[in-house]
């Protein structure tokens, strides 16, 4: 222990020795309890995002590792811990093309000692359990972070459950400036919800099993307390963080991942104590700063053997930082240049990783003998519009070269990867095409840039058909908008003016490309009955409404139960790799186009399958005895046959009724006159 001034300490020691006192009272004004806090900076679900960017007009952006260094250095004192709650090494192509190595290296080296620990998210297992377990220490200059998963057991290696970190603290007397040194020991335990493990590809987790995450955390927390930890923090990738926290004991705070939400709530744990539960969004859009308070009980003496620490978690607080905060710091008139230096220092570490990524992106995966355009040409002209419309309409000019076959390529890659019965991909997830010639990894990334992952789900044939039918209706409405926009542009207006006047449906991105089935569409049929034939490409069997099928799709559209209510009936089966990785795997094969053609299926149209043009209702001729004020007749477009006005049967019935009424009235008059 350190005591100042030294003269006061010497006097106390001498007096104590004379009196034979075993413990010594502090010569200054040492309080009975010292208030302090443990600062934990944290991230989750960054999904391979890594570089700072900011859109001032929208006020949104990505913090990235370089922005994180700015936020880290801007704190009044350095955070005590930097933790991550999973889904870190997989997502963006920058991460997946190096199998997570690029992200792991930045976590080790981006600033000071880098991260202290992370825990696996469900997507992080995409490179295999052994690769993930050793996903640290790539950099020779950084301090390796810990990969924690207390509930994972592997036949090929041991998973770490926890780490401890001892924090040096100093209290200073405000009057005589004497100081008192003490230590706070913090334990960190990590785990992944065992239910997430059940959806992972079996080959990726071969030899690895998952026990109850809550039980494993509780057991490890108890052990950490026995080892003298004053504060215990849990990092967990879990389906429902708040519910999960109610099952925990001996934990002061839960830093969660997986839900992609901003969470900041206090929950009562299984031991009756408060647990602060936090989560910081996703994709590095936010960074959290959790302050965990403690009271260090000194007993008013300089000895620390019998000192105790309590954590009043009810008083803890959380703050979220975004790219806007980074932008504000960089623009600070006093310290902005210092923060800019921090940013550039990390970017210098990112630069060689970017160069490696660019080299990988330029590698040729395979060749294409034809165009699979996104739009009218290789440049993607009108791709956004055409991927929502063209594939599902019989061409009026007989030109099939503009059909958006890129959707079929994508769906085929999903089928090839998973062996599923059917595949679907939403138009909003497609952002590029393939031109004839060499196909590079960069071309594939442009097609599927979002880092979405392939998943297989089970659903009935009836639910599949209902989703496809609704997609056709969305596409039909999109087609109407697009034709009106084209006509408006042809009349001399700009494309933006056309878009503003004839707007797209809000759910236009939910138009589905599909694969694994041969579909015949009859546009003369009403909504919900336009698919008149659907057979599987794998065996030629008819899609059975009562049968259950395996459907491969991306993890985004399958959760859209607003546009597709029947998706709520689906059951998740397996998680695979990223969508762009599936494309890379297909295009890298010899004769990949032949395989694609055999998997994709076809879209054809019934004998009467033409763009439905409703027959306009005839304008009624005004009677000389009626009001001749103009009346606007509004007709609603239908896809079936319009009802015919002036029906002959109705006219005969009406005439009979009128004649009968006249006869009755004449009879009454004749009777009264008699």
Language-model segment annotations:
Residues 34-39, 49-52, 63, 144-151, ...:
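Feature captures C-terminal
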Residues 28-322, 401, 406-409, 574-578:
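Acidic, metal/ion-coordinating pockets
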Residues 177-180, 294-439, 587-610:
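A short C-terminal boundary segment appended to hydrolase-like catalytic domains
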Residues 655-674:
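C-terminal membrane-anchoring or membrane-association module
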